[in-house]
Regions:
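Sequence/structural signature of beta-propeller domains
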Residues: 15-320
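C-terminal outer-membrane/trafficking sorting elements
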Residues: 321-360
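Bacterial N-terminal signal peptides
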Residues: 1-8
Length: 360
């Protein structure tokens, strides 16, 4: 749940360079951001804290609210009209904080993180899941479903506030990231299964995101400025890329999107223990919490704002001059070349992988 930003720079300015694990990180400049839409909250949903691109009906984005609602909605990237509303029984825990999608046993699922606990006094945490329904705005604009529910506790026996969830298609694993003020956030995991029933699962601790000394110390009651207050995360559908964002609602522009590229055979846990790359194109969003991948070259963010209509931002990988995404640009077809079992794009500057990296 978002709180008021009371300090920092103006929202149009980018964050400073990030100190993480004791190092000042270099920016990743391979991405650009554009506003693709504006969410009409009168027709859709307010306080969007989680989003996930539909895999069953491409072109739509699922959204959930942390405003004690018992439903999720789908809209397109323009955000003007609601395409679908999925309602759940009111008995489902209400403090939802993030949304993710993934594949399990050849079916597409949506996962809702019902684990918000700002005061760290609740202890009633779960991940709600459902098989993703098809979106048909004309014939089924509203659906009622009964989802599954996986209850969990943390391995340290403590209560934690959490606002970020991501799912790894390669290992069918759910990852949960705590939201911590003035300290580092922690990553936990559990395997996804359909047969947990009422059994409460104990998460596995994975790692901390950075170290405590990264955050600095308050001066004249000013808050810490490093990477804490994580609000959203996602893993690309093929498992290759990881995004984790924070939203510093106290020092506004000390907010970043961190990016990891997994190596072949590398686990999510091992990837997260390496240094990330903060994305230079990102600048502070008012109450911006939600993030999701569309594909390896595109992702979205939007805001938890409950007043006004928040923007929907689209991030696309930069391509060398004359090259756009070869998957969606028909003019690129004659530039594709197969070497062994790998597809590349030819340009005057050389060969590039399909995610825009030059082959040296």
């Amino acid at each position: 749940m978002a709180l008021l930003a009371i300090g920092g720079l103006s929202s149009c300015e980018a964050a400073p360079q990030l100190v993480y694990n004791g190092d000042t990180l270099a920016w990743n400049t391979d991405w650009k951001r554009t506003q693709c839409g504006t969410l009409d909250i009168s027709k859709n949903i307010i306080e969007v804290s989680g989003i996930a691109c539909s895999r069953v009906t491409p072109g739509y984005i699922w959204m959930q609210s942390d405003e004690r609602s018992n439903y999720i909605i789908a809209t397109d990237e323009k955000g003007a009209e609601r395409a679908c509303k999925v309602k759940f029984p009111k008995s489902i825990r209400w403090d939802w904080e993030d949304l993710s999608g993934g594949v399990y046993e050849d079916k597409n699922y949506l996962f809702i993180g019902a684990f918000g606990d700002n005061e760290e006094t609740d202890g009633n945490y779960s991940v709600i899941y459902l098989e993703e329904p098809a979106i048909d705005p004309v014939n089924t604009p509203e659906i009622t479903l009964t989802p599954g529910n996986i209850k969990f506790v943390y391995p340290d026996g403590k209560k934690h506030n959490c606002e970020a969830l991501m799912y790894d298609n390669l290992t069918q694993t759910i990852f949960i990231i705590t939201k911590v003020y003035y300290n580092v956030c922690q990553v936990f995991s559990m395997p996804f299964r359909l047969d947990y029933g009422d059994e409460t699962q104990t998460l596995e601790y994975i790692c901390d995101l950075g170290v405590r000394s990264d955050l600095g110390y308050s001066e004249k009651n000013q808050p810490y400025k490093g990477f804490h207050l994580v609000t959203g995360a996602d893993i690309s559908p093929d498992g290759k890329y990881i995004l984790i964002k924070n939203h510093n609602n106290i020092v506004a522009t000390y907010s970043w999107i961190l990016y990891w590229e997994r190596q072949d055979g590398e686990s999510v846990a091992d990837a997260l223990k390496r240094q990330p790359q903060p994305l230079k194109c990102y600048s502070y969003e008012w109450q911006g919490e939600a993030i999701c991948w569309l594909d390896n070259n595109t992702f979205y963010t939007t805001s938890d704002a409950d007043d006004g209509n928040p923007p929907i931002y689209k991030y696309t990988r930069k391509w060398p001059e004359g090259i756009n995404d070869p998957i969606v640009n028909d003019q690129m077809v004659n530039r594709l070349i197969m070497l062994g079992t790998t597809l590349f794009v030819r340009s005057a500057e050389g060969l590039y992988t399909l995610d825009g990296r030059k082959v040296e």
